[in-house]
């Protein structure tokens, strides 16, 4: 590999690989032969030839006005250009002069908590509606709840300056700089002594009995909207409302997540302390508990059992690549019942996400992992997720009994108390996370309907570009559509932002 600077025509680097096989001409065409030992580390081209090749490449690139892939040959010291074609898979050039400055000078920002679920650069609409507006709104809602619960007027913004989260070069960060001046000390003491204990007692029931049912009810309301007849403004209002509600849900669920994490860590620390080198961890005592993941696998295994009842369907599922399985089932005379089962599965579990940004597809939008799991379940009909869960639970109880017997009278009640807390709160963590992003199928349905309308009006290139404009820009595009006018400038802006992301 030789790298030449096309401007200065200088060799920047050279890496000579060991060559073991060479292609030679024969009477029948070509054949591969071993490279003689003395030639295996020879350079293919010298510096002068490499520079000459770079000069030819620069001229061809200038002629066509775009990067090109060039094939060449050398015979008797003369370079012959055989072919030149555009490079279609060239990644974008690195951005220049990129700075990673905090949103506010002198503050610390980290990728933790909620932003850990945002692994990639954010889409502009998610950045606006969720990261900036939604999370700050949910902080204010939490402040009101804490004040009403404790009777103490609390202003969380006194401890940290808004916003709670912001993006830097497209990546999400949350604030990690807090105000702990002497003037806030009395309020901080009251929060820790009076408010925090009440919050721990009340926030878990609030998440389970109020926030989660309320969140799901709002999702159901927006799922029922008449897409075809809803005005553009209503579609955008639904996107904004669902984004805000999911942010509210995150903070409501935070106490369940926190309690599960803390009780697990404390139990793990205690077990490691008293296990006398047995390498036990808290996870051994939390196996076989109620689990949404197990529930999902049980439902998928039920679909597999239905397929197993038909030799034709079973062979179809086993022989068809997962990427083409839905099409194959739709075309099969017995496939509709399986399609219905899969749709029911996705209605329950399809909102699950790998990236909290609602521009990213949900499991229902990109169900390849489900189809791969279904093929595995059909190929292994003896597997039973519920039976395995029961077996793990039985092993867990035997381990608990053995551990209790091994502890002394002082350690035993401590272990029981810590185990009870961890087993109580551990299932809440999975359930709380299960509903994060639950609004996204409904939100994406609204957004893509709006995107389809704006695409037909000439203000977007494709419906999914709706995620690359902010709400004010979408409102402007809708207003132009109502007037029979297109906004190609917004289509260009969305296209540029998508490329940047």
Task: Please give the residue ranges for each predicted region.
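A long amphipathic alpha-helix within ATP-dependent nucleotide-binding catalytic cores
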Residues: 33-73
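Extended active-site and interfacial segments that coordinate phosphate-rich ligands
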Residues: 1-29, 82-131
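Conserved catalytic core of nucleic-acid polymerases
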Residues: 2-45, 368-376, 382
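Generic beta-strand/beta-sheet core signal
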Residues: 73-75, 82-87, 469
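Contiguous hydrophobic, helix-prone segments at protein termini
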Residues: 43, 47, 62-68, 76, ...
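Protein kinase-like catalytic core scaffold
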Residues: 68, 80-83
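Flexible, active-site-adjacent loop/turn segments at secondary-structure boundaries
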Residues: 14, 19, 33, 43, ...
């Amino acid at each position: 590999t030789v790298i030449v600077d096309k401007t200065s025509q200088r060799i920047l680097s050279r890496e000579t690989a060991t060559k073991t096989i060479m292609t030679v001409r024969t009477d029948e065409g070509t054949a591969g032969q071993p490279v003689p030992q003395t030639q295996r580390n020879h350079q293919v081209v010298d510096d002068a030839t490499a520079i000459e090749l770079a000069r030819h490449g620069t001229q061809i690139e200038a002629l066509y006005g775009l990067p090109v892939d060039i094939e060449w040959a050398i015979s008797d010291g003369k370079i012959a250009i055989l072919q030149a074609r555009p490079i279609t898979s060239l990644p974008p050039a690195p951005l220049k002069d990129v700075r990673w400055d905090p949103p506010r000078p002198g503050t610390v920002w980290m990728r933790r908590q909620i932003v850990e679920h945002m692994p990639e650069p954010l889409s502009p609409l998610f950045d606006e509606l969720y990261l900036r507006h939604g999370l700050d709104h949910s902080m204010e809602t939490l402040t009101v709840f804490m004040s009403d619960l404790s009777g103490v007027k609390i202003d969380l913004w006194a401890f940290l300056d808004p916003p709670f989260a912001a993006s830097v070069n497209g990546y999400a960060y949350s604030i990690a700089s807090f105000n702990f001046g002497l003037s806030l000390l009395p309020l901080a003491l009251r929060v820790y002594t009076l408010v925090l204990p009440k919050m721990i007692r009340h926030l878990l029931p609030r998440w389970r009995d109020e926030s989660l049912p309320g969140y799901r009810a709002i999702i159901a309301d927006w799922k029922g909207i008449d897409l075809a007849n809803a005005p553009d403004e209503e579609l955008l209002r639904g996107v904004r409302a669902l984004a805000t509600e999911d942010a509210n849900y995150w903070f409501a669920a935070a106490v369940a997540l926190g309690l599960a994490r803390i009780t697990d860590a404390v139990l793990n620390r205690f077990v490691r302390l008293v296990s006398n080198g047995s390498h036990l961890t808290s996870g051994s005592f939390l196996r076989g508990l109620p689990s949404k993941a197990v529930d999902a696998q049980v439902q998928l295994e039920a679909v597999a059992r239905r397929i197993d009842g038909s030799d034709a369907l079973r062979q179809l599922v086993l022989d068809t690549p997962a990427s083409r399985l839905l099409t194959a089932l739709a075309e099969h005379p017995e496939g509709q019942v399986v399609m219905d089962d899969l749709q029911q599965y996705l209605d329950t579990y399809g909102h699950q996400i790998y990236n909290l940004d609602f521009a990213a597809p949900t499991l229902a939008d990109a169900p390849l992992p489900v189809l791969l799991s279904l093929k595995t379940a059909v190929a292994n009909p003896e597997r039973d997720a519920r039976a395995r869960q029961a077996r793990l639970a039985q092993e867990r109880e035997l381990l608990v009994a053995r551990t209790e017997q091994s502890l002394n009278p002082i350690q035993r009640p401590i272990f029981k108390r810590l185990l009870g807390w961890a087993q109580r709160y551990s299932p809440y963590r999975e359930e709380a996370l299960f509903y994060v992003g639950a609004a996204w199928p409904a939100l994406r349905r609204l957004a893509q309907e709006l995107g389809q309308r704006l695409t037909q009006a000439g203000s977007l290139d494709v419906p999914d570009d709706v995620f690359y404009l902010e709400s004010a820009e979408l409102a402007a595009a809708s207003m132009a559509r109502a007037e029979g006018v297109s906004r190609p400038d917004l289509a260009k802006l969305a296209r540029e932002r998508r490329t940047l992301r």
